[in-house]
A protein has these predicted regions:
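Extended hydrophobic leader/signal-anchor segments used for secretion and membrane insertion
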Residues: 1-435
Length: 435
């Protein structure tokens, strides 16, 4: 009893809610006084009485659900990489253990949920919003750093199209209008922060940083950021004729599904390569030239400006020439104008919960009061995928609020390739790979 009591007290101190200390009375009664039958479903057998196998299984299942749920909430949880936006650092089909204690676990904001599900079960929402808690994060080992892999709740996932749940509702509205979007993909669902889909990206800018992207490379506060080994940029690879051997490309670590080759072009118009891959491709005898694909202007300029945050034509940014952009930090105050409002309107209205409106004469009102400035209530981050030309990231939907941060990938415990059959679909070399 003493060991479990000490662990329980330490957990209560970490949680910071001392009402839970009353739980010590439950532990004491369960182990010592036995006044209340806390495990009411568990039958007590007389000597020689035959055990009920079904009740024993029920007891084991209930215990397992409680323990695993507790571990998932406060310590670590399993996730799967759904897309190629992080290749060649994290691969589609990687199954990860994500550490909640790295940055500190969030106290559940939506506690009524079906165990071992995130937001959907049998096509229906797997949670109830009857109880909603305010955002609170427990102490972690450290804060998010530049260059960290981060798992977070998708900020634009607050509103979801029932027919196309993986699509970005807000992007649809910007491109096609709200009425058409709802008619085509609706009805819509509104999800609380902790029940929005999980994304994993690399943090490239912290609260208070100024970020720029020049020639596809990231700069923070005027200094060029480290080009991490897994970062891929797109290149046009011209060959002397024909394809490059697929085995050669696979050995380089390329995802063949991302390579376009139709025989009418002398090579590959868009090949995602890390610096190491770039050096190797340049040595292939059939390769004539390798040139970076950089968007000075988007292909459908100027309409495509609407696809890049802050979704205004006067920004003039592309995915390879982006910013400078200041990342909001808690307690900082900015002057508000109609020109810079697109940068902060979702922060004010969606993430920090204020009523925001503008008038025809150019005035800005927050919670019914005219406002010329705004003080941020949370920290914000800027996330980008390592596969820089095949990643929907903060360049396309903006800042990631601190209350959306879930944890840090710690280890790949399984990795599978959906394009192959067992056992060739197992990436054995990635088993138990530390991230």
């Amino acid at each position: 009893m003493g060991f479990w009591s000490v662990l329980y007290v330490l957990w209560v101190i970490w949680l910071g809610n001392y009402w839970w200390l009353f739980g010590l009375a439950v532990i004491f009664d369960h182990h010592i006084t036995h006044k209340v039958k806390w495990m009411f479903w568990k039958k007590e057998y007389k000597e020689g009485e035959k055990r009920n196998v079904w009740l024993d299984w029920l007891d084991a299942i209930i215990f397992a659900v409680i323990v695993v749920t507790f571990i998932n909430i406060f310590f670590f949880q399993a996730f799967k990489i759904p897309s190629s936006s992080m290749e060649s650092s994290l691969f589609t089909g990687d199954h990860l253990f994500v550490s909640k204690v790295a940055f500190g676990p969030k106290v559940p904001q939506t506690p009524l949920s079906v165990p071992f599900t995130h937001n959907v079960i049998f096509g229906k929402e797997s949670y109830s919003t009857l109880i909603q808690n305010d955002y609170r994060r427990l102490k972690g080992f450290r804060n998010v750093r530049r260059g960290d892999y981060v798992v977070f709740n998708f900020p634009d996932g607050d509103t979801v199209l029932s027919r196309f749940p993986s699509e970005d509702y807000h992007a649809w509205v910007r491109n096609a209008g709200k009425a058409y979007t709802i008619a085509s993909g609706g009805p819509i669902k509104v999800r609380p922060v902790d029940k929005r889909d999980h994304y994993v990206k690399r943090c490239v800018a912290l609260p208070g940083d100024t970020l720029s992207v020049v020639d596809g490379l990231v700069y923070t506060n005027g200094e060029k950021q480290e080009v991490y080994p897994g970062i891929q940029l797109s290149y046009t690879v011209v060959t002397s004729g024909g394809r490059i051997n697929s085995r050669t490309l696979e050995k380089l670590g390329l995802n063949l599904e991302e390579l376009y080759f139709d025989g009418t072009l002398p090579g590959y118009p868009a090949m995602p390569l890390t610096q190491a891959m770039l050096d190797e491709v340049g040595r292939i005898s059939s390769v004539v030239s390798v040139e970076p694909n950089l968007d000075v202007y988007p292909p459908d300029y100027p309409d495509s400006y609407l696809s890049l945050f802050p979704f205004t034509e006067n920004a003039g940014w592309t995915r390879d020439y982006y910013g400078p952009l200041w990342i909001p930090e808690k307690g900082a105050t900015v002057a508000l104008t109609l020109e810079n409002l697109p940068l902060y309107e979702r922060i004010i209205s969606a993430y920090e919960g204020h009523e925001l409106r503008t008038t025809a004469d150019g005035k800005i009102f927050i919670d019914g009061k005219e406002a010329s400035s705004y003080t941020f209530e949370m920290d914000y981050y800027f996330m980008m995928g390592d596969n820089r030309h095949n990643s929907l990231d903060s360049r396309y939907w903006g800042f990631v609020p601190e209350d959306h941060i879930v944890g840090r990938p710690a280890m790949v415990w399984l990795s599978t390739d959906a394009g192959r059959k067992f056992p060739n679909n197992i990436r054995w070399r990635r088993f138990f790979k530390i991230v």
